[in-house]
Amino acid sequence: MHCTVNGQPRELPDEITVEGLIEILGLASAICAAEVDQKIVPKRERSETVLKEGQSIEIVTLVGGG
């Protein structure tokens, strides 16, 4: 299935969840935020939110520093 992830076109497996995408990207779920079609997906809903063809997904990680 074709989606846009962080502004880049990407081929994803069918029936993948937001949590599954975070795992594929190699990110730590605890320190990132997810948005699908400009709507924030709460952490508790990531494993239940199945992505669909053509959606736009943004995954943002937190970075410490100073």
Regions found by a protein language model. Name each.
Residues 1-65:
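Ubiquitin-like/PB1-type beta-grasp interaction modules and other compact soluble beta-rich domains
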